[in-house]
Amino acid sequence: MNIQALLSDKVSQALIAAGAPADCEAQVRQSAKAQFGDYQANGVMAVAKKLGMQPRQLAERVVELLDLTGIASKIEIAGPGFINIFLDRQWVAEKVEYALTAPKLGVAPVEPQTIVVDYSAPNVAKQMHVGHLRSTIIGDAAVRTLAFLGHNVIRANHVGDWGTQFGMLIAYLEKMQNENASDMGLSDLELFYQQAKKTYDEDEEFALRARAYVVKLQSGDEYCRQMWRKLVDITMAQNQVAYDRLNVTLTKDDVMGESLYNAMLPEIVADLKAKGLAVESEGATVVYLDEYKNKDGEPMGVIIQKKDGGYLYTTTDIACAKYRYETLGADRILYYIDSRQHQHLMQAWAIVRKAGYVPESVPLEHHMFGMMLGKDGKPFKTRSGGTVKLSDLLDEAVERAGKLIAEKNPDMPADELKQVINAVGIGAVKYADLSKSRTTDYIFDWDNMLALDGNTAPYMQYAYTRVVSVFRRAGVDENSLTLPLVITEDREAALATRLLQFEEIITTVAREGTPHVMCSYLYDLAGLFSSFYEHCQILNAESEEIRQSRLKLAMLTAKTLKQGLDTLGIQTVERM
């Protein structure tokens, strides 16, 4: 049930009937304060200006023509021409009843699209670190949200599995196998990479062999490809452990590494030349873009092939977009890559559009994000200044959550305690990130993220347990609630209306890739339930009808909190 869309349609019809152009915008929004109703239509002022009318006069005409029979109990004009809409409580109650039993909480089915989501993208032969966290969990929240709405979502893990460094890595893997030390060395990928680089820098014979292996690998040598595949498989097996711990939906089947596009690169360079988009410049192949100027004010040159014949990341990204449209059939392509890559992507996509590889009707969207910072405002590091491994971060999260949860639940069975600790610890790290606007940097703070109050995962998980505990104490389930829902109190109405806004919220998150909007909604919902719980008797209500009615509100609250947290990849628990 998308109330905002329903009211927008109704107000737009009234505006058009009042003389507004067909493309007018009703600008219906959720009201910030209860005194302004549940929704407010703000589009009258802009339309009145176009029509040369007084806004208040147009607002009065719109209200006369606005048919909200059975939907609104009252419509008021405020200020110069704001239209305040107060929803009818019986109508709200009926919609809550529907959401309680309907599939997906009553969220209307969408026309499904094929949507490719590019996220995570770790490098082969390197351990995942905190720098991979944001792309991985924000991208996965987008995937979960889009899938919930009914879209065909293709997860694309654009793994860094190609490049000149693989000659060095293959040579070092070979060296270790000859020394029967393969398993030991690859158990710590970071150490493996560092030792390979050290050997490359210090041993000229090793360096020559490494450079030879680069050429062999790129020409399809079977031995080199086997060694390369082993490196990829070992890396992705270790990454899968991290994905599973994070409750992220990526698997090995979602890997679409840089190597996937190798065969396309020569064809793309040739095609761009044939179309007159690429030219030779000092031995390299370059595309000049008028949209981007260099320091001299001239079109910026984007190299797609070096003079030694090598290709660049831009070339791969052009091929990647082409593949996702032509082969995967994408209707929309989302990239969860940090903000530092924005210009690079924009240049690649400019070439993609000019070449006609992806039509303008298929959006290419860079859902960029900022950095995770330490309390000092600098990039988050270890105390010694090193990169924080993702596995170490998650270990510490679980350890800290363990102290918090075990202290409050001394009698909880060990298996349940372990599950709760893991859900709270991992959830705290994820929610702290997801609850911030992805476009900004944020400060990583253990105390804040594990707090049991405020907009945190532990608070949200506790809020859920508080709701479900009502049903344990009542000894009822959904099927036993047979009496109709009635709304008589303001706090009931506020909670019920907010519950019905779930579809508006999840639609916004799907459109804009903004999981913090879902976090804010769930936090607000938990607060409204808390106020309702404290002021409206549930189990000891004055009548069985009111008791069941309030239990239904509690039931939909539990379902909405659980579903909302699930779209974020945050696990709920029954007790805390």
Curated annotation (Swiss-Prot):
One of its GO terms (cellular component) is cytoplasm. The keyword Isomerase does not apply. Its EC number is 6.1.1.19. PANTHER family: ARGININE--TRNA LIGASE, CYTOPLASMIC, ARGINYL-TRNA SYNTHETASE. GO terms for molecular function: arginine-tRNA ligase activity; ATP binding. The gene is argS. HAMAP family: Arg_tRNA_synth. This is Arginine--tRNA ligase. Its main location: cytoplasm. It comes from Yersinia pseudotuberculosis serotype O:1b (strain IP 31758).
